[in-house]
């Protein structure tokens, strides 16, 4: 399906501020919510529409509305929730899935500790959100789980991606399109994206 880099000037400006090491936790969290609105706009750009009959104060008309079942936003905990908040402001009727994964710092492999999703995700568009696509291990594991539950129409949304992560992800799930604000240089020896912005979860919650 490929990779879409969202190059909108507002996205890039806000991302630069988020990258700065002196940006405060409060500012980082606010910027993440703001940028999630802009990214959500892009990832939902080609949703299908139908029409319904309504009445304006002046006359009846056929007006466009979203077709099909409501979206599912699937957040990879915990950092994914930073993107989720803004996206729910934009699409408040969306269903939500939570996927609890943490990365073993020695093996860099994901360990699942929580999974909760709507039962009827088979015919829904599922947008998986996680700020970072680094090794891609967590993203691949999350989408493996969603596909086990029957999801077939999936997109992945992140702030930053590493070339190594994109390569692994697209090999594992070639049917899932990736949306990101930036493809950075590479991964370092600890599996962090560089130049990156640090650990998104730690910067969002003020933890180490």
UniProtKB/Swiss-Prot annotation:
GO terms for biological process: UMP salvage; uracil salvage. InterPro entries: PRibTrfase_dom, PRTase-like, Upp_B, UPRTase/APRTase, Ura_phspho_trans. Belongs to the UPRTase family. Binds 1 Mg(2+) ion per subunit. The magnesium is bound as Mg-PRPP. Its EC number is 2.4.2.9. Catalyzes the conversion of uracil and 5-phospho-alpha-D-ribose 1-diphosphate (PRPP) to UMP and diphosphate. It comes from the Bacteria. Uracil binds at residues 193, 198-200. It comes from Brucella melitensis biotype 2 (strain ATCC 23457). SUPFAM superfamilies: PRTase-like. Allosterically activated by GTP. This is Uracil phosphoribosyltransferase. Pfam families: UPRTase (PF14681).
């Amino acid at each position: 399906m490929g990779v879409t880099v969202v190059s909108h000037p507002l996205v890039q400006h806000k991302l630069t501020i988020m990258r700065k090491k002196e940006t405060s936790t409060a500012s980082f969290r606010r910027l993440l919510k703001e940028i999630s609105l802009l990214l959500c706009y892009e990832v939902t750009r080609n949703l299908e529409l139908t029409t319904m009959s309504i009445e304006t104060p002046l006359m009846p008309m056929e007006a466009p509305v979203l077709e099909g079942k409501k979206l599912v936003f699937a957040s990879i905990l915990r950092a994914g929730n930073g993107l989720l908040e803004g996206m729910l402001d934009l699409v408040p009727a969306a269903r939500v899935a939570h996927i609890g994964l943490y990365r073993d710092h020695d093996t860099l492999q994901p360990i699942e500790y929580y999974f909760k999703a709507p039962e009827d995700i088979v015919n829904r568009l599922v947008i998986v959100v996680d700020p970072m696509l680094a090794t891609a291990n967590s993203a691949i594991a999350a989408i493996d789980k969603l596909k086990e539950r029957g999801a077939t129409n999936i997109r992945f949304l992140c702030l930053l991606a590493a070339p190594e992560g994109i390569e692994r992800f697209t090999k594992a799930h070639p049917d899932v399109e990736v949306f990101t604000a930036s493809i950075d240089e590479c991964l370092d020896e600890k599996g962090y994206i560089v130049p990156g912005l640090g650990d998104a979860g730690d910067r969002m919650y003020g933890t180490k």
